[in-house]
UniProtKB/Swiss-Prot annotation:
Gene3D superfamilies: HUPs (3.40.50.620). Keywords: ATP-binding, NAD, Nucleotide-binding, Nucleotidyltransferase, Pyridine nucleotide biosynthesis, Transferase. One of its GO terms (molecular function) is ATP binding. This is Probable nicotinate-nucleotide adenylyltransferase. HAMAP family: NaMN_adenylyltr (MF_00244). One of its GO terms (biological process) is NAD biosynthetic process. Pathway: Cofactor biosynthesis; NAD(+) biosynthesis; deamido-NAD(+) from nicotinate D-ribonucleotide: step 1/1. It catalyses: nicotinate beta-D-ribonucleotide + ATP + H(+) = deamido-NAD(+) + diphosphate. Catalyzes the reversible adenylation of nicotinate mononucleotide (NaMN) to nicotinic acid adenine dinucleotide (NaAD). It comes from Geobacillus thermodenitrificans (strain NG80-2). Its EC number is 2.7.7.18. Transmembrane segments: none annotated. Belongs to the NadD family.
């Protein structure tokens, strides 16, 4: 029997905060693996614009590359409609009846558990793991394992905002993710890597690399 941590999110984009949280829970609970679960349409974000699934999946692949116990489960991307956790966990437990699942959520989500879709049935299928965050209560009528992780003020919205403002995101996201964002011009990135390469056109590599450090 495997102990599998499920870490759901839009990962728009994935960043080091996600990876640290996942790795700390993996270690604290001695889990076999962490499965990152990118959402197709999160119920609480149905009215928000979300980056294409293909781009979010590729960034997540780049983010987790090289970690032997980090994997990606695309079940929600393949399913139409809102991504309800109950539907996903029910499907996963049917597909992997010998595994034990732990669903990882941030402290900001713990207080909303009473509002989750079919929560009373869901807690019979999965163990919730709440990651503590300053300023958020972990009080809930539902059973939640609490895990402490190092605190970093990084969020996907912060990353998107910095990209839109032309600020560097180096060391906030894995390098492969940063380069992908630039290459694809995601989040309003002003200059893509491909643009830099085309614009160089005869300029010495060293001089142009200096000008292009985090965007031309």
């Amino acid at each position: 029997m495997g102990k599998i941590g499920i870490f759901g999110g839009t990962f728009d984009p994935p960043h080091y905060g996600h990876l640290i949280m996942a790795n700390e829970v993996l270690d604290a609970l001695q889990l076999s693996q962490i499965w990152f679960l990118p959402n197709r349409i999160p119920p609480h974000k149905q009215n928000e614009q979300v980056t294409r699934s293909e781009d979010r999946l590729r960034m997540l692949e780049l983010a987790v590359a090289g970690h032997p116990r980090f994997h990606i489960e695309t079940i929600e991307l393949e399913r139409e409609g809102p991504s309800y956790t109950y539907d996903t966990i029910r499907q996963l437990t049917a597909m992997h009846p010998d595994d034990e699942f732990y669903f990882i959520i941030g402290a900001d989500m713990v207080e909303y558990l009473p509002n989750w879709h079919r929560i009373d049935e869901l807690i019979e299928l999965v163990t919730f793991v709440g990651v503590k965050r300053p300023g958020f209560s972990m009080e809930t009528p539902y059973p939640v394992i609490e895990v402490e992780v190092p605190q970093f003020a990084i969020s996907s919205s912060l990353i998107r905002e910095r990209v839109q403002n032309g600020q560097t995101i180096r060391y906030l996201v894995p390098e492969g993710v940063r380069l992908y964002i630039e290459e694809k011009g995601l989040y309003g990135a002003r200059t893509s890597v491909a643009d830099c390469e085309r614009a160089a056109d005869g300029t010495s590599l060293r001089a142009y690399a200096w000008r292009c450090r985090d965007g031309c």
